[in-house]
Design a protein with these regions (language model features):
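Active-site phosphate-binding strand-loop segment of PLP-dependent enzymes
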Residues: 1-75, 80-88
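Glycine-centered secondary-structure boundary/capping sites
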Residues: 20, 164-165
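Active-site region of PLP-dependent enzymes
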Residues: 46-52, 59-162, 168
């Protein structure tokens, strides 16, 4: 199906890993190599899934993770990209574009955007990733704020101190 959809305008193949399952990345990468295409994985619904001993999001040129409220790792907004060392993409350029085009402090080499996640949201994502990777998240069935588990996820971090404020 993928090869039949490739045209002269095609620049990338974007497989979407769903329900903790990883697409057949060896086959997809082989097709991409044959046609000189980039592979960009959408890994939002398969955080922590593996194939051939490698994590989803690290099986191609670029892995993307959404942290939107319905995703496995949830910070209400934002996301993350991963660029493996063997990627054909320019990781320093991508990093600069996500950081307002800066290649170093006050040096803007590219037209860029502010795609930086706020530090408290990074902490939330990091906390959930740690729980998820150690199996605690799946055992507890943590999913989101409706479960009332964010205080546990956030306050379990040494960098965060809970204020002793009551509702009085």
């Amino acid at each position: 199906l993928i090869e039949a959809a490739i045209s002269p305008k095609t620049k990338a193949i974007m497989p979407v890993h769903l329900f903790g399952q990883v697409c057949e990345m060896d086959k997809i990468n082989k097709i991409a190599k044959k046609h000189n295409l980039v592979v960009i994985e959408d890994t939002s619904q398969s955080f922590g899934a593996e194939q051939n001993g490698k994590l989803a999001g690290m099986l191609s040129d670029l892995g993307t993770f959404s942290f939107q409220k319905t995703k496995n790792i949830n910070t209400f907004e934002g996301g993350m990209i991963c660029i493996p060392k063997n990627s054909k993409l320019d990781a320093p350029k991508i990093r600069a574009i996500c950081n307002q085009g800066q290649t170093s402090k006050y040096h803007h080499e590219y037209l860029g955007f502010n795609f930086r996640l706020a530090e408290p949201l990074c902490l939330m994502a990091y906390s959930q990733m740690k729980l998820h990777m150690t199996g605690i998240k799946s055992e507890l069935g943590l999913r989101g704020p409706k479960d009332g588990h964010y205080p546990y996820v956030v306050y379990d971090q040494p960098a965060i101190k809970k204020l002793g404020i009551t509702g009085d």
